[in-house]
C-alpha cells in the first residue's frame, strides 16, 4: 500500500481499525493519520518499505517467486542491520534479509501472503474481467490482484458499471 487518503476519513483511513488489520506494509503513512495512530500505539504491525520495492515485490508474489532481490534499501532503514523497515515495537517478523549473490550484498524482501486486494476499475463483465480504461492510473492493479489471488486471498474491485 502507498497509504492513499485525504488526511481525514478517506483512503486507508477507512481501514484504520485494530480489529480490521494485523499488519500494514506501506511506503509511508502521511495521508492516513488514523493509521499513524495505530502504528504509534503498537496496535498493528507496520513496515515501511520503498514504494517501488512494494510494487516489484507484489509482482514477485503474484508470480510465485521467492521474493525480491535488489540493492534498493541497502544501508537505509530497511536494511536488516538498521531495523528491516519495522515501524514499531510490536513488529517482529523479519521480512528483509541480507544475502550475497555473485559476491555482492543484496537485500531479499521475503514474499508474504496478501489477504485482500481492494482496487478500482471502470467496467467489469459477469466473468470478473475488469477494465481500467477510464481510471487515472492503474498503480499495479494487476500485480495486486494476482498477488492476492495466488496467495489464496480475495480481490475486491469497485467499478462504475457491469
Set out the residue ranges of the language-model regions:
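Conserved alpha/beta enzyme-core scaffold
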Residues: 1-162
Amino acid at each position: 500500500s502507498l497509504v492513499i487518503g485525504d488526511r481525514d476519513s478517506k483512503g486507508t483511513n477507512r481501514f484504520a481499525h485494530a480489529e480490521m488489520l494485523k499488519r500494514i506494509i506501506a511506503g509511508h503513512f502521511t495521508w492516513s493519520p488514523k493509521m499513524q495512530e495505530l502504528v504509534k500505539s503498537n496496535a498493528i504491525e507496520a513496515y515501511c518499505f520503498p514504494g517501488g520495492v512494494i510494487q516489484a515485490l507484489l509482482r514477485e508474489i503474484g508470480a510465485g517467486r521467492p521474493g525480491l532481490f535488489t540493492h534498493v534499501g541497502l544501508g537505509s532503514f530497511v536494511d536488516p542491520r538498521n531495523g528491516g523497515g519495522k515501524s514499531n515495537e510490536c513488529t517482529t517478523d523479519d521480512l528483509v534479509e541480507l544475502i550475497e549473490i555473485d559476491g555482492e550484498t543484496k537485500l531479499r524482501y521475503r514474499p508474504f501472503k496478501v489477504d485482500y486486494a481492494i482496487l478500482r476499475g471502470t467496467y467489469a463483465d459477469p466473468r470478473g474481467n475488469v477494465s481500467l480504461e477510464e481510471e487515472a492510473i492503474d498503480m499495479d492493479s494487476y500485480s495486486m490482484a494476482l498477488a492476492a489471488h495466488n496467495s489464496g486471498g480475495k480481490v475486491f474491485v469497485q467499478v462504475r458499471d457491469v
